Amino acid sequence: MTDAQVFTILAIALVPAVMAALLGSALARS
């Protein structure tokens, strides 16, 4: 795989995790 492909896969994997963490922290604080 090229560096671009690795970066794309990491971004696709990380974005949902970050969104879930932000949503969870927002719900926990409310």
Curated annotation (Swiss-Prot):
<keyword id="KW-0603">Photosystem I</keyword>
<dbReference type="InterPro" id="IPR037279">
    <property type="entry name" value="PSI_PsaM_sf"/>
</dbReference>
<dbReference type="Pfam" id="PF07465">
    <property type="entry name" value="PsaM"/>
</dbReference>
<dbReference type="GO" id="GO:0009522">
    <property type="term" value="C:photosystem I"/>
</dbReference>
<dbReference type="GO" id="GO:0031676">
    <property type="term" value="C:plasma membrane-derived thylakoid membrane"/>
</dbReference>
<keyword id="KW-0793">Thylakoid</keyword>
<dbReference type="InterPro" id="IPR010010">
    <property type="entry name" value="PSI_PsaM"/>
</dbReference>
<keyword id="KW-0812">Transmembrane</keyword>
<comment type="similarity">
    <text>Belongs to the PsaM family.</text>
</comment>
<dbReference type="GO" id="GO:0015979">
    <property type="term" value="P:photosynthesis"/>
</dbReference>
<protein>
    <recommendedName>
        <fullName>Photosystem I reaction center subunit XII</fullName>
    </recommendedName>
</protein>
<feature type="transmembrane region" description="Helical">
    <location>
        <begin position="6"/>
        <end position="26"/>
    </location>
</feature>
<keyword id="KW-0602">Photosynthesis</keyword>
<keyword id="KW-1133">Transmembrane helix</keyword>
<keyword id="KW-0472">Membrane</keyword>
